[in-house]
Amino acid sequence: MGASGRICTVVPVEDAGEAAMLALSSPTGCVELRLDFYPGDPGEALELLATRLHSPARVVVTLRSAGHGGLDRRARGERRAVLARLEDLAPEGWLVDYEVEDLHASSGCSGCIASSHPTTPPTPRRALEEAAVAERLGASAYKLVYPGVEPWEQAAAARLVAEAGGFATSFTLGPGTLASRLTALALGAPLVFGSHPRAPLDGVPQSSEIMELYLRMGLGES
């Protein structure tokens, strides 16, 4: 898959209609629908979005919890039911993001993304073990993101991507986040994430900038 399909443009879903327009204007071939921004029933928003989005080709559906840096404050038990419903409602080929706690509490998933957002990086061995468990539980990709200022923290993220053979993505948050995302992309990560130019998020580089710099590196076509 080209870089455009591996760079997901984040779309905060505050209003389903506006989110659909943002998604359709994504500068990359992948969008992430952040349903934790939605004030109502996330399933209702997803149903509406599913009828309107015939492009981009790749869509990630996310209900990020407050414990992982998002806005959703449902208890894990309630989240499990909501995520299962989102997976049922999602069109074929769309990926639902399961935080690792949700995935472990469920009976697995069908091609989801297993994500983890710790405050400190796990050891590379622990990260690889967690990725392996996620794969056994049905995930098609593993995502590990954490704050990182020191060079070794960014190197640890890159090592996971390199050793996971296209199954894992990992990058750091903070001053070096753009370089960390580019490194993950260059090493074959299945996904990295950037903000929409019309809906910027604090601390998240724009997906169009990630794409531009990746192509400038001369590593491949979009």
Curated annotation (Swiss-Prot):
**Active site located where?**
117, 143
Q: CDD domains attached here?
A: DHQase_I
Q: What is this protein called?
A: 3-dehydroquinate dehydratase
Q: What does the record give as its pathway?
A: Metabolic intermediate biosynthesis; chorismate biosynthesis; chorismate from D-erythrose 4-phosphate and phosphoenolpyruvate: step 3/7
Task: Tell me the SUPFAM superfamilies matching this sequence.
Answer: Aldolase
Q: How does it assemble?
A: Homodimer.
Give the family, as the similarity comment puts it: Belongs to the type-I 3-dehydroquinase family.
UniProt record, GO biological process? amino acid biosynthetic process; aromatic amino acid family biosynthetic process; chorismate biosynthetic process
An MF annotation (GO) of this entry: 3-dehydroquinate dehydratase activity
Q: Which reaction does it catalyse?
A: 3-dehydroquinate = 3-dehydroshikimate + H2O
The gene it comes from is aroD
Q: Which UniProt keywords apply?
A: Amino-acid biosynthesis, Aromatic amino acid biosynthesis, Lyase, Schiff base
Where does this protein hold 3-dehydroquinate? 32-34, 64, 181
Protein role: Involved in the third step of the chorismate pathway, which leads to the biosynthesis of aromatic amino acids. Catalyzes the cis-dehydration of 3-dehydroquinate (DHQ) and introduces the first double bond of the aromatic ring to yield 3-dehydroshikimate.
Cysteine disulfide partners in this protein? none
Q: What is its EC number?
A: 4.2.1.10
